[in-house]
Amino acid sequence: MVKVDGYEIPEGLHYSKDWFWVKIEGGKAKMGMTDYAQKQLREIVFVELPAAGGTVKANEPFGSVESVKAVSDLISPLSGTIDQVNPEVTGKPEMLNEDPFNKGWLLIITPSNLNDELAKLMDFNASVEWHKSLIAKG
């Protein structure tokens, strides 16, 4: 794990420019919001997620998150069928602020176009550099 200006970026994940991380585990993709995103939103008070069995499409909204600052769409980094929705996050939205990379995951999906879509995401090193460039811009 690396910290860039206080923002945690774990190794072994893929990252989208829409503030999502992806962890591939046995043909499934666990997805969640990055540390940078949750800190920008500040105190998260509500999360709306789709039901298991539905589908998500890469680069399209699948839910929303509400904070004391704003309401934001959740943009999926991958396409696929939703296997699991994290019930802890919908019942306790602050979990996204407290532990975005472990207990604060959002969905587990079976990807439908994994190789092509994964190639469009950033790896750990690219994500670190991207975060540095964002922070430098202010």
Residue ranges of model-derived segments:
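Acidic, low-complexity mobile loops and tails
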Residues: M1-A58, E98-D99, K103-N113, K120-G138
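Short, conserved beta-turn/loop elements at beta-strand boundaries and strand-helix junctions
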Residues: I24-G27, V85-G91, D116
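Short, well-structured beta-strand-loop connectors
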Residues: A51-V65, S76, T81-Q84
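Mid-chain, well-packed structural core segment of small domains
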Residues: V68-K103
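Short beta-strands and strand-coil junctions in structured, solvent-facing domains, enriched
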Residues: V71, N115-L118
